């Protein structure tokens, strides 16, 4: 695998420069939003996951498949559409897909597949998911309302506002559980990669890590409203709602660990794959050419966007002279 490192480094640097706006925007969200602070841990986690597979990768050599670079054309088209409509998340996801394509083109099918889990984990670098916040608010509000009905607590719901005799609660965007959901899914994917070897078990556990935090957030919101009813004051119950949230998140993570632990698969019996040692190792020129092919075809999208912007600017009417 070591011969591929220079080509990957050059390719990643070139793509980083090409998509620098996406990188800057992503890091800005990591810093400003608590829902995405965990993104700073993604690259160290990926590095550890690759290191954890060192026994399987013994003797692994890259066999580039340069022709897969053609997939950069439709991905670039997706990036272009996202750029035209102003969806930064779409641009970032397309850019990350190009990065995945770079790894595939340089490493080859077998080596890429051996590293598929860690490499796909790189998608957590993209701060996506904000678009589901209204849906999460709907789910949390409905869960809380039905829970109050079951508990016999009088309530009136208008959109995301829940009124009880003791006061009013509002299911704000921050209360929808997005940050808990994203963090739980990131943890669930990491746990699945470390504890399971079969893709079936990994997929099941990841699905569980999506469902459990959504339900848990509903219980959290219901608990806060019910506590306000018991205390006789909505303000008193909502005072420490952030603390309650982190306690619930800790419980969710513990619950996921407990649910997944009995089904873990032993990782100690992993052996190095047969890497066809008799095949010739690809030259540095071949590896760099594969990376260059991905870069050149991916560059068509940003280049087209720049040309469109220049043409649009040229069509704008000139400002009248100042008097």
Identify what each model region corresponds to.
Residues 1-323:
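Hydrophobic N-terminal alpha-helices or hydrophobic patches in metabolic proteins across all domains
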